[in-house]
Amino acid sequence: MKFLDEAKVYIRSGDGGNGCVAFRREKFIEFGGPNGGNGGRGGDIIVEAADGLNTLIDYRYQQHFKAQKGGNGMGSDRHGAGGKDIVMKVPVGTQIFDEDKETLIHDFTKVGERFVLAKGGNGGFGNAHFKSSTNRAPRHANPGLPGEERWIWLRLKLIADAGLVGLPNAGKSTFLSKVSAAKPKIADYPFTTLHPQLGVVNSDGREFVLADIPGLIEGAHEGAGLGDRFLGHIERCRVLLHLIDATCEHAGKAYKTVRGELEAYAETLVDKIEIVALNKIDAVEPDELKKQKDRLKRAAKKTPLLLSGVTGQGVPEALRALVAVIGEAPVSDKAIGTADNPAEAKPWAPQDA
Protein backbone atom coordinates (compact mmCIF):
# COMPACT_ATOMS: atom_id res chain seq x y z
CA MET A 1 0.00 0.00 0.00
CA LYS A 2 1.28 3.48 -0.89
CA PHE A 3 2.33 5.57 2.09
CA LEU A 4 0.88 9.05 2.53
CA ASP A 5 1.59 11.08 5.63
CA GLU A 6 -0.32 14.29 4.91
CA ALA A 7 -3.68 15.22 3.43
CA LYS A 8 -5.87 18.30 3.15
CA VAL A 9 -9.56 17.64 3.81
CA TYR A 10 -12.79 19.65 3.72
CA ILE A 11 -15.38 18.87 6.39
CA ARG A 12 -18.91 20.10 7.03
CA SER A 13 -21.21 18.97 9.79
CA GLY A 14 -24.93 18.63 9.14
CA ASP A 15 -27.39 21.51 9.40
CA GLY A 16 -30.13 21.27 11.99
CA GLY A 17 -33.65 20.46 10.80
CA ASN A 18 -36.34 23.14 10.74
CA GLY A 19 -39.08 23.34 13.33
CA CYS A 20 -42.67 22.81 12.18
CA VAL A 21 -45.76 25.03 12.45
CA ALA A 22 -48.78 22.75 12.89
CA PHE A 23 -52.02 22.57 14.87
CA ARG A 24 -54.00 19.67 16.19
CA ARG A 25 -56.92 18.86 13.92
CA GLU A 26 -59.39 16.42 15.42
CA LYS A 27 -63.13 15.91 15.23
CA PHE A 28 -65.12 17.70 17.93
CA ILE A 29 -62.00 19.55 19.14
CA GLU A 30 -62.32 23.14 17.98
CA PHE A 31 -59.11 24.55 19.43
CA GLY A 32 -56.59 21.72 19.30
CA GLY A 33 -53.56 23.92 19.94
CA PRO A 34 -50.07 23.85 18.40
CA ASN A 35 -48.31 20.51 17.91
CA GLY A 36 -45.44 21.28 15.54
CA GLY A 37 -42.34 19.21 16.36
CA ASN A 38 -38.74 20.30 16.64
CA GLY A 39 -36.13 19.76 13.94
CA GLY A 40 -33.44 17.10 14.39
CA ARG A 41 -29.81 17.85 15.15
CA GLY A 42 -27.34 17.69 12.26
CA GLY A 43 -24.73 14.96 12.10
CA ASP A 44 -21.25 15.45 13.59
CA ILE A 45 -17.88 14.95 11.92
CA ILE A 46 -15.91 12.59 14.19
CA VAL A 47 -12.31 11.47 13.76
CA GLU A 48 -11.31 8.13 15.27
CA ALA A 49 -7.90 6.49 15.62
CA ALA A 50 -8.32 2.99 14.21
CA ASP A 51 -6.15 -0.08 14.57
CA GLY A 52 -4.53 -1.57 11.48
CA LEU A 53 -4.01 1.70 9.57
CA ASN A 54 -0.59 3.17 8.82
CA THR A 55 -1.25 5.63 5.99
CA LEU A 56 -3.57 8.49 5.05
CA ILE A 57 -3.82 7.35 1.43
CA ASP A 58 -7.64 7.10 1.59
CA TYR A 59 -7.84 10.87 2.00
CA ARG A 60 -6.10 11.45 -1.31
CA TYR A 61 -9.12 10.02 -3.13
CA GLN A 62 -11.87 11.36 -0.88
CA GLN A 63 -11.26 14.87 0.37
CA HIS A 64 -14.77 16.15 1.12
CA PHE A 65 -16.86 14.93 4.04
CA LYS A 66 -20.37 16.27 4.67
CA ALA A 67 -22.56 14.95 7.47
CA GLN A 68 -26.30 14.44 7.08
CA LYS A 69 -28.78 17.22 7.78
CA GLY A 70 -31.23 16.78 10.64
CA GLY A 71 -34.82 15.93 9.75
CA ASN A 72 -37.51 18.60 9.83
CA GLY A 73 -40.14 18.58 12.56
CA MET A 74 -43.68 17.50 11.69
CA GLY A 75 -47.18 17.80 13.07
CA SER A 76 -48.55 15.68 15.90
CA ASP A 77 -45.47 16.60 17.98
CA ARG A 78 -43.18 14.53 15.77
CA HIS A 79 -39.56 15.62 16.04
CA GLY A 80 -37.12 15.32 13.17
CA ALA A 81 -34.53 12.54 13.21
CA GLY A 82 -30.93 13.40 14.00
CA GLY A 83 -28.52 13.46 11.07
CA LYS A 84 -26.12 10.56 10.68
CA ASP A 85 -22.59 11.21 11.94
CA ILE A 86 -19.56 10.72 9.72
CA VAL A 87 -16.63 8.90 11.34
CA MET A 88 -13.27 9.44 9.68
CA LYS A 89 -10.77 6.66 10.44
CA VAL A 90 -7.14 7.65 10.82
CA PRO A 91 -4.00 5.81 12.00
CA VAL A 92 -2.71 6.21 15.53
CA GLY A 93 -0.17 9.02 15.47
CA THR A 94 -2.26 11.33 13.29
CA GLN A 95 -2.37 15.02 14.10
CA ILE A 96 -5.07 17.45 12.97
CA PHE A 97 -3.99 20.97 12.02
CA ASP A 98 -6.10 23.97 11.09
CA GLU A 99 -5.96 25.35 7.55
CA ASP A 100 -3.22 27.77 8.61
CA LYS A 101 -0.96 24.68 8.89
CA GLU A 102 0.28 25.76 12.32
CA THR A 103 -2.57 25.47 14.83
CA LEU A 104 -2.69 21.97 16.30
CA ILE A 105 -6.29 20.87 16.88
CA HIS A 106 -5.81 17.32 18.15
CA ASP A 107 -3.19 14.57 18.44
CA PHE A 108 -4.24 10.90 18.36
CA THR A 109 -2.03 8.66 20.49
CA LYS A 110 -4.07 5.52 21.19
CA VAL A 111 -6.41 3.14 19.39
CA GLY A 112 -10.09 3.98 19.76
CA GLU A 113 -9.50 7.62 20.65
CA ARG A 114 -12.24 9.88 19.26
CA PHE A 115 -12.49 13.61 18.66
CA VAL A 116 -15.53 15.59 17.49
CA LEU A 117 -14.09 17.85 14.83
CA ALA A 118 -17.31 19.61 13.82
CA LYS A 119 -20.60 19.53 15.72
CA GLY A 120 -23.89 19.38 13.86
CA GLY A 121 -26.26 22.32 14.02
CA ASN A 122 -29.10 22.25 16.53
CA GLY A 123 -32.60 21.68 15.23
CA GLY A 124 -35.12 24.52 15.25
CA PHE A 125 -38.04 24.61 17.70
CA GLY A 126 -41.52 23.83 16.43
CA ASN A 127 -44.45 26.07 17.32
CA ALA A 128 -45.46 23.76 20.18
CA HIS A 129 -42.33 24.94 22.00
CA PHE A 130 -43.52 28.54 22.02
CA LYS A 131 -46.93 27.84 23.53
CA SER A 132 -47.49 29.87 26.71
CA SER A 133 -50.28 31.22 28.88
CA THR A 134 -50.29 34.43 26.87
CA ASN A 135 -49.73 32.90 23.42
CA ARG A 136 -51.99 29.88 23.08
CA ALA A 137 -51.58 29.51 19.32
CA PRO A 138 -48.07 30.52 18.19
CA ARG A 139 -47.71 30.58 14.43
CA HIS A 140 -43.95 30.62 14.11
CA ALA A 141 -41.10 28.09 14.36
CA ASN A 142 -37.30 28.31 14.26
CA PRO A 143 -35.13 27.19 11.36
CA GLY A 144 -32.30 24.79 12.13
CA LEU A 145 -28.84 26.16 12.82
CA PRO A 146 -26.17 25.64 10.13
CA GLY A 147 -23.38 23.14 10.68
CA GLU A 148 -19.68 23.95 10.92
CA GLU A 149 -17.38 23.83 7.92
CA ARG A 150 -13.62 24.15 7.58
CA TRP A 151 -10.53 22.89 5.78
CA ILE A 152 -8.07 20.90 7.86
CA TRP A 153 -4.71 19.20 7.44
CA LEU A 154 -4.14 15.63 8.58
CA ARG A 155 -0.55 14.73 9.32
CA LEU A 156 0.67 11.27 10.32
CA LYS A 157 3.65 10.74 12.57
CA LEU A 158 4.49 7.08 12.70
CA ILE A 159 4.63 5.44 16.11
CA ALA A 160 7.41 2.87 16.11
CA ASP A 161 9.51 1.22 18.80
CA ALA A 162 12.74 1.98 16.97
CA GLY A 163 13.72 4.22 14.08
CA LEU A 164 16.56 3.93 11.56
CA VAL A 165 18.33 7.23 10.96
CA GLY A 166 21.38 8.17 8.95
CA LEU A 167 22.60 9.89 5.80
CA PRO A 168 21.26 8.79 2.41
CA ASN A 169 22.75 5.48 1.24
CA ALA A 170 23.74 4.43 4.78
CA GLY A 171 22.08 1.05 4.20
CA LYS A 172 18.93 1.61 6.24
CA SER A 173 16.54 0.01 3.73
CA THR A 174 18.83 -2.98 3.26
CA PHE A 175 18.95 -3.46 7.03
CA LEU A 176 15.14 -3.26 7.30
CA SER A 177 14.64 -5.78 4.51
CA LYS A 178 17.15 -8.10 6.20
CA VAL A 179 15.43 -8.14 9.60
CA SER A 180 11.75 -7.95 8.57
CA ALA A 181 9.34 -8.82 5.78
CA ALA A 182 9.26 -5.20 4.58
CA LYS A 183 10.17 -4.67 0.92
CA PRO A 184 11.59 -1.16 0.65
CA LYS A 185 13.12 0.01 -2.60
CA ILE A 186 16.89 -0.56 -2.55
CA ALA A 187 19.34 0.98 -5.02
CA ASP A 188 22.86 2.40 -5.16
CA TYR A 189 21.95 6.08 -5.22
CA PRO A 190 20.92 8.65 -2.58
CA PHE A 191 17.29 9.22 -1.58
CA THR A 192 16.12 5.80 -2.75
CA THR A 193 13.67 5.83 0.16
CA LEU A 194 11.18 8.64 -0.40
CA HIS A 195 8.63 7.61 2.24
CA PRO A 196 9.00 6.03 5.70
CA GLN A 197 8.80 2.24 5.75
CA LEU A 198 7.63 0.05 8.63
CA GLY A 199 8.65 -3.51 9.44
CA VAL A 200 7.92 -5.90 12.29
CA VAL A 201 11.12 -7.45 13.63
CA ASN A 202 11.39 -10.66 15.64
CA SER A 203 14.49 -11.07 17.77
CA ASP A 204 14.74 -14.08 20.08
CA GLY A 205 10.95 -14.23 20.39
CA ARG A 206 10.56 -10.50 21.05
CA GLU A 207 8.72 -8.42 18.44
CA PHE A 208 9.03 -4.70 17.83
CA VAL A 209 8.22 -2.21 15.07
CA LEU A 210 11.15 -0.70 13.17
CA ALA A 211 10.77 2.40 10.97
CA ASP A 212 13.08 3.29 8.10
CA ILE A 213 13.18 7.10 7.93
CA PRO A 214 14.33 8.69 4.62
CA GLY A 215 17.92 9.91 4.73
CA LEU A 216 18.90 13.27 6.20
CA ILE A 217 21.53 15.62 4.82
CA GLU A 218 23.08 18.81 6.15
CA GLY A 219 20.46 21.55 6.18
CA ALA A 220 17.51 19.15 6.24
CA HIS A 221 15.82 21.13 9.02
CA GLU A 222 15.84 24.12 6.65
CA GLY A 223 14.40 22.16 3.74
CA ALA A 224 17.52 20.73 2.07
CA GLY A 225 17.17 17.33 0.40
CA LEU A 226 13.84 15.90 1.44
CA GLY A 227 13.70 18.58 4.13
CA ASP A 228 12.32 18.12 7.60
CA ARG A 229 9.11 16.54 6.36
CA PHE A 230 10.02 13.19 7.87
CA LEU A 231 11.86 14.39 10.96
CA GLY A 232 8.53 14.41 12.77
CA HIS A 233 8.32 10.63 12.50
CA ILE A 234 11.46 10.34 14.62
CA GLU A 235 9.72 12.18 17.49
CA ARG A 236 7.60 9.15 18.32
CA CYS A 237 10.30 6.48 18.04
CA ARG A 238 11.40 5.23 21.43
CA VAL A 239 14.93 4.27 20.36
CA LEU A 240 17.11 5.32 17.41
CA LEU A 241 19.47 3.04 15.51
CA HIS A 242 21.94 5.37 13.83
CA LEU A 243 23.61 3.72 10.83
CA ILE A 244 26.82 5.16 9.38
CA ASP A 245 28.23 4.01 6.05
CA ALA A 246 31.71 2.56 6.58
CA THR A 247 32.59 3.42 2.96
CA CYS A 248 31.98 7.15 3.46
CA GLU A 249 34.84 9.63 3.63
CA HIS A 250 34.71 10.27 7.40
CA ALA A 251 32.39 8.31 9.71
CA GLY A 252 32.71 10.85 12.53
CA LYS A 253 31.63 13.77 10.35
CA ALA A 254 28.71 11.75 8.96
CA TYR A 255 27.55 11.03 12.49
CA LYS A 256 27.79 14.67 13.58
CA THR A 257 25.87 15.84 10.49
CA VAL A 258 22.82 13.77 11.36
CA ARG A 259 23.01 14.61 15.06
CA GLY A 260 23.19 18.29 14.19
CA GLU A 261 20.03 18.05 12.08
CA LEU A 262 18.16 16.25 14.86
CA GLU A 263 19.15 18.90 17.39
CA ALA A 264 18.28 21.75 15.02
CA TYR A 265 14.79 20.33 14.49
CA ALA A 266 14.07 19.65 18.16
CA GLU A 267 16.39 19.35 21.14
CA THR A 268 14.36 16.47 22.55
CA LEU A 269 15.42 14.26 19.61
CA VAL A 270 19.05 14.19 20.73
CA ASP A 271 17.96 13.03 24.18
CA LYS A 272 16.51 9.79 22.81
CA ILE A 273 18.33 6.54 23.45
CA GLU A 274 20.65 5.97 20.51
CA ILE A 275 22.51 2.89 19.32
CA VAL A 276 25.33 3.69 16.89
CA ALA A 277 26.38 1.15 14.27
CA LEU A 278 28.92 1.17 11.47
CA ASN A 279 27.29 -0.47 8.45
CA LYS A 280 28.70 -2.01 5.23
CA ILE A 281 31.76 -3.40 7.01
CA ASP A 282 32.01 -6.05 4.28
CA ALA A 283 32.85 -3.35 1.73
CA VAL A 284 36.00 -1.92 3.36
CA GLU A 285 39.47 -3.21 4.15
CA PRO A 286 40.31 -4.09 7.79
CA ASP A 287 42.72 -1.15 8.18
CA GLU A 288 40.17 1.34 6.87
CA LEU A 289 37.45 -0.23 9.03
CA LYS A 290 39.57 0.31 12.15
CA LYS A 291 40.11 3.98 11.23
CA GLN A 292 36.41 4.54 10.63
CA LYS A 293 35.49 2.80 13.87
CA ASP A 294 37.91 4.99 15.84
CA ARG A 295 36.58 8.15 14.16
CA LEU A 296 33.01 7.19 14.94
CA LYS A 297 33.85 6.25 18.52
CA ARG A 298 35.40 9.67 19.14
CA ALA A 299 32.44 11.50 17.59
CA ALA A 300 29.71 9.47 19.30
CA LYS A 301 31.60 9.02 22.58
CA LYS A 302 30.58 5.36 22.59
CA THR A 303 31.78 2.16 20.97
CA PRO A 304 29.80 1.55 17.76
CA LEU A 305 28.44 -1.81 16.70
CA LEU A 306 29.84 -3.30 13.50
CA LEU A 307 27.44 -4.87 11.03
CA SER A 308 26.64 -5.59 7.41
CA GLY A 309 23.07 -5.49 6.16
CA VAL A 310 24.08 -7.50 3.09
CA THR A 311 25.89 -10.42 4.72
CA GLY A 312 24.01 -10.29 8.03
CA GLN A 313 27.20 -10.03 10.06
CA GLY A 314 26.53 -8.25 13.36
CA VAL A 315 22.79 -7.87 12.65
CA PRO A 316 21.57 -10.23 15.44
CA GLU A 317 23.70 -8.34 17.96
CA ALA A 318 22.20 -5.03 16.83
CA LEU A 319 18.67 -6.40 17.21
CA ARG A 320 19.42 -7.70 20.70
CA ALA A 321 20.78 -4.29 21.65
CA LEU A 322 17.54 -2.68 20.43
CA VAL A 323 15.36 -5.15 22.33
CA ALA A 324 17.37 -4.56 25.49
CA VAL A 325 16.70 -0.81 25.52
CA ILE A 326 13.21 -0.61 23.96
CA GLY A 327 11.56 -1.80 27.16
CA GLU A 328 13.37 0.86 29.20
CA ALA A 329 12.81 3.77 26.80
CA PRO A 330 9.90 6.15 27.45
CA VAL A 331 7.01 6.14 25.01
CA SER A 332 7.14 9.36 23.00
CA ASP A 333 3.51 9.51 21.96
CA LYS A 334 3.13 13.27 22.16
CA ALA A 335 4.32 15.76 19.60
CA ILE A 336 6.87 18.30 20.70
CA GLY A 337 5.29 21.12 22.71
CA THR A 338 1.76 19.66 22.67
CA ALA A 339 1.57 17.79 25.95
CA ASP A 340 0.42 20.74 28.04
CA ASN A 341 -0.33 23.59 25.67
CA PRO A 342 -1.26 22.87 22.04
CA ALA A 343 -0.76 26.52 21.21
CA GLU A 344 2.96 26.11 21.87
CA ALA A 345 3.31 23.24 19.42
CA LYS A 346 6.15 23.48 16.96
CA PRO A 347 4.69 24.87 13.73
CA TRP A 348 4.53 22.49 10.82
CA ALA A 349 4.01 23.46 7.22
CA PRO A 350 2.86 20.63 4.96
CA GLN A 351 4.05 20.67 1.38
CA ASP A 352 1.25 21.81 -0.91
CA ALA A 353 0.47 18.82 -3.09
UniProtKB/Swiss-Prot annotation:
Keyword RNA-binding: no
EC number(s) recorded for this UniProt protein: 3.6.5.-
One Pfam family hit: MMR_HSR1
Chain ranges passing through the membrane: none
Sites where the protein binds GTP: 166-173, 191-195, 212-215, 279-282, 308-310
Annotated OBG-type G domain residues: 160-327
Residues given in the record as Mg(2+) binding sites: S173, T193
Swiss-Prot/TrEMBL keywords: Cytoplasm, GTP-binding, Hydrolase, Magnesium, Metal-binding, Nucleotide-binding
UniProt enzyme class: hydrolase
Gene Ontology CC: cytoplasm
Record-annotated Obg domain positions: 1-159
GO MF annotation list: GTP binding; GTPase activity; magnesium ion binding
Family: Belongs to the TRAFAC class OBG-HflX-like GTPase superfamily. OBG GTPase family.
Chain's role: An essential GTPase which binds GTP, GDP and possibly (p)ppGpp with moderate affinity, with high nucleotide exchange rates and a fairly low GTP hydrolysis rate. Plays a role in control of the cell cycle, stress response, ribosome biogenesis and in those bacteria that undergo differentiation, in morphogenesis control.
Quaternary organization: Monomer.
UniProt name for this protein: GTPase Obg
The species this protein was found in: Rhodopseudomonas palustris (strain ATCC BAA-98 / CGA009)
